[in-house]
Regions:
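Amphipathic alpha-helical "lid/sensor" segments that cap RecA-like P-loop NTPase cores
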Residues: 1-31, 111, 115
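C-terminal leucine-rich, beta-strand-based interaction scaffolds used for sensing/assembly
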Residues: 27-165
């Protein structure tokens, strides 16, 4: 993120353009998004050109996509972290859990919580996801899957055992 977004001439525009693209891909269940004034503002459209030049994105005609799916997942993780920081993660995910594209981002979010923020943060997210209605079980399952992929997964699973048997 630092190299491709933050340490550039247009960090805000590049970050916003990448986040908008990642969100639109997942929300619309598409791999490419048409670059137009409805989807991207003028600053974002300019930043998209720079992201294509830096090979983070690929352009075909009037559409853009991430060079690799992992870039999109990585940016969607950033979107989720931003929503969590503002206290709107559950609200943000409410209408989005029917899109499988968000699943990897939720799993990565769980992984991020376990590896960077600790078990308490993971437990808070797990509890908060209970408010997602019909999607609560799915969101919680994705967080649980993250625990199996973390460094020291046996230790993480042992620490999470009380939550798992509730």
């Amino acid at each position: 993120w630092d190299q491709q977004i933050e340490n550039t001439a247009q960090p805000l525009e590049r970050g916003s353009a990448a986040a908008t693209l990642a969100r639109l891909q997942a929300d619309r269940l598409v791999t490419e998004v048409r670059v137009d004034a409805e989807a991207f503002d003028a600053g974002e459209r300019s930043a998209l050109t720079a992201l294509v030049d830096d090979r983070l994105l690929t352009r075909r005609d009037d559409r853009v996509r991430f060079e690799h799916d992992l870039y999109g997942d990585w940016v969607r993780l950033r979107v989720l972290r931003s929503q969590a920081e503002s206290g709107r993660l559950v609200e943000f995910l409410e209408g989005r859990m029917d899109s499988p594209v968000w699943y990897r981002a939720v799993r990565l979010y769980g992984l991020h919580l376990l590896e960077h923020d600790g078990l308490a943060s993971w437990r808070e997210a797990f509890a908060a996801f209970g408010d997602l209605g019909d999607a609560a079980d799915l969101a919680r399952d994705l967080l649980l899957e993250a625990s199996a992929h973390t460094v020291g997964s046996a230790r993480a699973l042992s620490a999470l055992w009380p939550v798992l048997v509730e």
